């Protein structure tokens, strides 16, 4: 069996169902009335399908905590084929029973605790097999403005979607959050959306068993009558499938096609949205605050009746874009540019820097006392790189880099003082070099000022069946470059011509650059021309590095 080919057919059939037509070559015998897939349970006990799921889970879970049975990846690798065969037979006979989840509490940013449910390794494998079958079906149905826990999509895509809507003269925004989405989501709603895609009672019974498996707290198993475990393999997909109903409800609140053109002429309100998991924003144009508040009540009623969920009162607000709003850790606000035009800005959220300080202190302090300073600095550097990779799309990231370096330097100095029992002056003299923390010749604390802001961006690529997980940042970078080369060949060719003319050197500082770390700068400002296209002619472009480009435009 070719797993990717099967997923491709599942995706094609589901897409055909959405378009209200029958697939020409369906994988499973389907009813001519609804096009739902049958005999999906046969995939669950197929040796190739189950082995593929096991290998994916073992690769991701190598260093993860075990479930209630205590079995780790290295334990499962011993007699791997026999264990897979036993698991396959249990699924085929219908005797497989998921074990309860191990409950772990982790702190949230607001000081509360978030419950995580850790399944055992065998349950993860079966859940992965379920996900491999369901994901292609649901991806054909998911709305394009949903970005959470989906292949080739990330929080950055959602943020840039919001920026795009702000640029399109959407003035009011409803910033919303679903209250305890994973904990309160209705099992009935989950089974209903799965049943819309699958006509297989055995498969539905398997999903129901996972939903009712329960959680183990202090050795006592507590039943689960609602919600999906945060930590389960299929939990994000099932939650997305239910919230997809909300996406299409919000889609229907806006105007599209010819209706949108007529609505624009008539001055009627229009709405657009972006959603990442249970966080979402609805943007409204040509509408008043009262209209936005009325739409918020419609959303509240829809969630309550269709999904069995409630809006979080303390996190759902109606805000004007000029006042700014928080979304996914960023602060988005409409600012006024130097030429008097409206410019949507992406800024660091108010919790971003305190969160960074806490993580740095934890990386430098919460370890065995005998651990060396070099190892602690390496771990802190990983925190700096990870935090910067997420927040470097913010417009104020370059401006705050020096302040962040200052914070990181003194947090590291204080941690070194505690470990070595020396004074601050001694720590700075031994490890501080021109505002840098350096241990030996090869270990240095990564500096924020050396990380460029992320400028190049384009939308997420279409879903391709066979993708196994949400894309990593490196994979997203590759997809961005493919998108540029494929859909913007003229721009890429012009960039290469400018780079060759400038001999791949920054025209301000003289450093060497390449395709990835170079920027095209307009010698004469764009506002001196009638359009952006007229400003972007060959003679008006020059090569600059990231630092020089942003110093030119934002260091004033």
Where are these regions (language model features)?
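Short Cys/His-rich Zn2+-coordinating modules
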Residues: 483-494, 523-531
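Histidine-centered nuclease catalytic patch
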Residues: 510-543, 556
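A conserved non-catalytic segment of reverse transcriptases
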Residues: 212, 218, 306-372, 378, ...
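Right-hand nucleic-acid polymerase module
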Residues: 354-423
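Conserved polymerase palm-domain catalytic core
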Residues: 90-94, 98-100, 104, 109, ...
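Short cysteine-rich loop/turn motifs with clustered Cys
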Residues: 490-519, 543-547
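Non-catalytic, polymerase-adjacent accessory regions of viral genome-replication enzymes
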Residues: 1-82
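Extended C-terminal regions of large enzymes
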Residues: 404-411, 416-485
């Amino acid at each position: 069996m070719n797993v990717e080919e099967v997923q491709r057919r599942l995706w094609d059939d589901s897409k055909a169902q959405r378009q209200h037509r029958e697939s020409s070559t369906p994988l499973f015998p389907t009813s001519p009335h609804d096009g739902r897939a049958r005999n999906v349970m046969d995939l669950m006990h197929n040796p190739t399908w189950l082995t593929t799921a096991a290998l994916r889970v073992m690769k991701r879970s190598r260093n993860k905590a075990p479930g209630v049975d205590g079995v780790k990846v290295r334990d499962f690798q011993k007699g791997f084929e026999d264990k897979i065969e036993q698991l396959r037979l249990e699924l085929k006979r219908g005797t497989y029973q998921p074990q309860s989840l191990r409950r772990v509490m982790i702190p949230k940013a607001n000081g509360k605790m978030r419950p995580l449910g850790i399944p055992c390794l065998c349950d993860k494998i079966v859940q992965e097999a379920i996900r491999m079958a369901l994901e292609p079906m649901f991806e054909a149905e998911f709305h394009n403005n949903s970005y959470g826990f989906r292949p080739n999509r990330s929080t950055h895509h959602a943020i840039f979607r919001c920026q795009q809507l702000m640029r399109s003269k959407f003035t009011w925004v409803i910033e919303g959050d679903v209250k305890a989405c994973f904990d309160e989501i209705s099992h009935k709603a989950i089974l209903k959306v799965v049943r819309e895609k699958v006509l297989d009672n055995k498969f539905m019974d398997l999903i129901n068993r996972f939903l009712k498996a329960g959680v183990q707290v202090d050795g006592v198993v507590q039943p689960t009558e609602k919600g999906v475990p945060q930590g389960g393999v299929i939990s994000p997909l099932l939650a997305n499938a239910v919230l997809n109903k909300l996406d299409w409800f919000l889609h229907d609140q806006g105007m599209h096609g010819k209706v949108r053109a007529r609505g624009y002429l008539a001055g009627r309100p229009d709405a657009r949205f972006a959603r990442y998991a249970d966080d979402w924003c609805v943007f409204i144009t040509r509408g008043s605050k009262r209209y936005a508040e009325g739409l918020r009540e419609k959303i509240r009623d829809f969630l309550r009746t269709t999904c069995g969920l409630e809006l979080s009162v303390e996190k759902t607000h109606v805000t004007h874009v000029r006042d700014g709003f928080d979304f996914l850790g960023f602060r988005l606000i409409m600012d006024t540019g130097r030429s008097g035009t409206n410019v949507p800005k992406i800024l660091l959220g108010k919790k971003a820097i305190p969160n960074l300080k806490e993580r740095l202190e934890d990386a430098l302090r919460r370890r065995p006392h005998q651990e060396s300073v070099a190892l602690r600095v390496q771990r802190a550097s990983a925190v700096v790189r990870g935090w910067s990779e997420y927040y470097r799309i913010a417009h104020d990231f370059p401006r705050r880099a020096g302040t962040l370096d200052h914070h990181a330097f003194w947090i590291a100095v204080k941690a070194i003082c505690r470990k070595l029992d020396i004074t601050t002056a001694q720590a700075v003299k031994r490890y501080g070099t021109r505002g840098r923390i350096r241990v030996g010749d090869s270990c240095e604390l990564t500096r924020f000022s050396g990380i460029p802001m992320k400028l190049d961006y384009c939308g997420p690529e279409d879903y391709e069946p066979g993708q196994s997980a949400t894309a990593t940042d490196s994979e997203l970078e590759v997809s961005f470059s493919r998108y540029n080369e494929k859909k913007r060949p003229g721009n890429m060719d012009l960039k290469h011509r400018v780079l060759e003319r400038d001999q791949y050197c920054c025209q301000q500082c003289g450093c060497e650059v390449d395709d990835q770390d170079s920027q095209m700068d307009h010698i004469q400002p764009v506002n001196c021309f009638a359009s952006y296209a007229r400003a972007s002619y060959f003679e008006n472009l020059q090569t600059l590095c990231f630092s020089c480009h942003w110093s030119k435009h934002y260091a004033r």
